[in-house]
């Protein structure tokens, strides 16, 4: 009887897949101004996809659902009902000190 000690090797070299190694740039979504923060008119409050947060008092909604302040004031994030959230900007009186 003939015994052969045989070791088989791979006939193709293992190579990393070219289907990996890509990723899209982050979109930098999220809140840009916190609750109670003073903002100027035109400042972006929230960048979002869809209306996770709805526009409230003195807040506008852009074409890409971005929320922005329409007046100078203080940002307030509020809950309306069980699940709806909204962002509002309430104007504040600023005293000008004449010197």
From Swiss-Prot:
This is Large ribosomal subunit protein bL27. One of its GO terms (cellular component) is cytosolic large ribosomal subunit. Keywords: Ribonucleoprotein, Ribosomal protein. The N-terminus is cleaved by ribosomal processing cysteine protease Prp. The lineage of its organism: Bacteria, Bacillati, Bacillota, Clostridia, Eubacteriales. Residues 1-9 form a propeptide. InterPro entries: Ribosomal_bL27, Ribosomal_bL27_CS. GO terms for molecular function: structural constituent of ribosome. GO terms for biological process: translation.
């Amino acid at each position: 009887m003939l015994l052969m000690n045989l070791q088989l090797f791979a006939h193709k070299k293992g190579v990393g897949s070219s289907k990996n190694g890509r990723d899209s740039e982050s979109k930098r979504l999220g809140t840009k101004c916190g609750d109670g923060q003073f903002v100027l008119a035109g400042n972006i409050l929230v960048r979002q996809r869809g209306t996770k947060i709805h526009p409230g008092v003195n807040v506008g909604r852009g074409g890409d659902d971005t929320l922005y302040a329409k007046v100078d004031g203080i940002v307030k994030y509020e809950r309306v009902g069980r699940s709806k959230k909204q962002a509002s900007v309430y104007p504040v009186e600023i005293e000008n000190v004449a010197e």
